[in-house]
A protein has these predicted regions:
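Alpha-amylase-like alpha-glycosidases and glucanotransferases acting on alpha-linked glucans and related
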Residues: 1-5, 12, 18, 56-194, ...
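Catalytic domains of carbohydrate-active enzymes, especially glycoside hydrolases
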Residues: 2, 27-52, 287-288
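Surface-exposed amphipathic alpha-helices with a cationic face
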Residues: 37, 197-205, 330, 354-355
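Outer-envelope exported proteins of Gram-negative bacteria
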Residues: 47, 210-212, 216, 290, ...
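Conserved, well-ordered alpha-helix/loop/beta-strand core segments that scaffold catalytic motifs
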Residues: 186, 190-219
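Structured C-terminal cap/extension of enzyme domains
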Residues: 455-507
Length: 509
């Protein structure tokens, strides 16, 4: 990361303001980039962009390579002439501008996207043909996977008919012919997703704003990745998992966390020169400027739980690939800007891996005052940082700063006030002080969720782990990111040496 000081904002694409029910690559996204630039910000951190499954979590995606069709701008398709404004306005996408109604989005968006595809004559587009060729290593399998999944009523691929579940050649040939137009529809949506995303990213980069992407260490069991590459995962001869991922019991959970993702066969990956991982990361760095890798400790040791267990109590630790993977990444791809998400209890060997990789790790100020901590709360206090880290007030999994301060114990609130040496401000004043604290820290990069700048409570929380129903829904309302707030953020960014000084393209002229 070097000695350059940066700051940025965390906001998922889905949380952008939008006319049609969910944040996407529409004009609102470009306006948000302009607002970030006016606020002196140099980074925009987002969440994974893959197509989401039934829980709507971007960390449980149908593909690690594909993009979420929800993010395709309908406004752009109207301008292309493949949809009309009247058609889009007639669809019920939900009534709340600060909330995503995923059921209505699912029903409405795909109908419109199918109309756009049918009118597009996409097979005659040379750019589409080029896209198919360039993305051949994943696109065909993904499109077939989604087409077959739709044919079988959306059930997981592990419940499909045996011939296609086990990818017998005659079954693959049959479904490729039988579902030709459905497959092309899936490929069309990916083409539009990547076409629109490339334009938005270029717009941001031109204004000095780098995109920080996010990838989970694991893929979902019900994904094109596991279906198309079963040999890379711990599956049996019927392609059922033998072990799944999670976290052991700790001070926060007596039964641990059962994530259910299939585990990697690291010996197979090593024997292939980590080819799948090289393709995955190369793909990510075509999409993003910086990549945050979730659960980085899993590359040192990962927690394996017998498949079928109801909790994580009977799991055990196994060794991951360690530096072998990242030496290969460096050799094949060159130096890349990676953030190692190393939150939680860290062993000495995990710390050594992060240090040897050279990647900046993460600091979350909310973790610095936790009485339940298992031993490394002081690591999150700013006086213990070095330059090679990224500091956050909170992540997508955390309470908002205001919600957090309201919910912690009186003893913890006293610890915060004592550290800030502030015994008189109200809760919002304390949150402003916390933002100043991390912005003024020695950390090379500082990322703050937009909700914390807005001083919003936990109604604006993005995700509460291990819960269902209310997650991934919050949206920024039109006008909330005000000119006044942008000016305040600009002053902070300038004062603490983090300002994005890139000239606007118009100013350069």
């Amino acid at each position: 990361m070097g000695n350059q000081r940066e700051c940025g904002v965390l906001l998922p694409i889905s949380s952008l303001p939008s006319k049609y029910g969910i944040g996407c690559f529409s004009k609102s996204a470009y306006e948000f980039v302009d607002q970030l630039k006016a606020a002196g910000q140099g980074c925009w951190q987002i969440l994974p962009l893959g197509p989401t499954s039934y829980g709507d979590s971007p960390y449980q995606s149908f593909s690690t390579f594909a993009g979420n069709p929800y993010f395709i701008s309908l406004e752009d398709l109207i301008e292309e002439g493949v949809l009309t404004k009247k058609e889009c306005d007639a669809v019920d996408f939900g009534s709340r501008e600060d909330d995503v109604d995923y059921e209505k989005i699912y029903k409405g968006r795909y109908k419109l996207l199918r109309k756009a595809y049918e009118r597009s004559e996409i097979s005659k587009n040379p750019d589409f043909v080029r896209f198919q060729q360039e993305q051949a290593h994943w696109l065909g399998d993904y499109a077939l996977f989604m087409a077959v999944k739709d044919r079988f009523g959306g059930i997981p691929w592990t419940e499909w008919a045996e011939d296609i579940r086990l990818r017998w050649n005659n079954a693959l040939d049959y479904y490729r012919k039988e579902l030709y137009f459905e497959i092309e529809f899936q490929e069309y949506m990916q083409f539009k997703f990547y076409e629109q995303w490339a334009k938005l990213k270029a717009y941001a980069n031109k204004r000095g704003i780098r995109i920080i992407g996010d990838i989970p260490i694991y893929v979902a069991m019900d994904s094109a990745d596991t279906w198309a590459n079963p040999g890379l995962f711990k599956l049996d001869e019927n392609n059922e998992p033998t072990q799944v991922a999670g976290c052991p019991p700790d001070g926060f959970s007596a039964t641990g966390q059962l994530w259910g993702n299939p585990l990697y066969r690291w010996d197979v990956h090593r024997n292939t020169g980590f080819e799948w991982w090289i393709k995955r990361l190369a793909h990510c760095f075509n999409m993003y400027d910086v990549v945050r890798i979730d659960h980085f400790r899993g590359f040192d040791e990962y927690y394996a739980i017998p498949y079928g267990d109801k909790d994580a109590k009977r799991g055990w630790w196994e060794k991951g690939p360690g530096m072998d993977l990242f030496r290969t990444v460096s050799y094949r791809l060159g130096h890349k800007d990676i953030i190692a998400e190393d939150l939680g209890f860290m062993t000495d060997s995990v710390k050594r891996l992060v240090e040897e990789s050279g990647y900046p790790n993460m600091k979350v100020i909310e973790f610095a005052f936790d009485e339940r901590d298992t031993g490394n709360a002081s690591d999150y206090l700013p006086h213990n940082y070095n330059n090679n880290c990224v500091v956050y007030t909170g992540t997508h999994d955390n309470e908002t700063l205001l919600g957090w301060f309201a919910d912690i114990t009186p003893e913890e609130r006293h610890m915060v006030r004592e550290y800030l040496w502030n015994f008189h401000d109200d809760e919002k004043g304390i949150c402003r002080n916390m933002i100043r604290l991390v912005m003024g820290s020695v950390a090379g990069r500082c990322i703050i969720p937009i909700q914390d700048y807005l001083l919003l409570d936990n109604k604006a929380r993005i995700n509460q782990p291990s819960t269902l129903g209310k997650n991934w829904k919050w949206r920024l309302k039109e006008g909330q990111f005000s000119n006044e707030l942008q000016k305040e953020m600009l002053i902070l960014a300038t004062r603490f040496g983090r300002r994005n000084w890139t000239l606007d393209p118009e100013e350069e002229k």
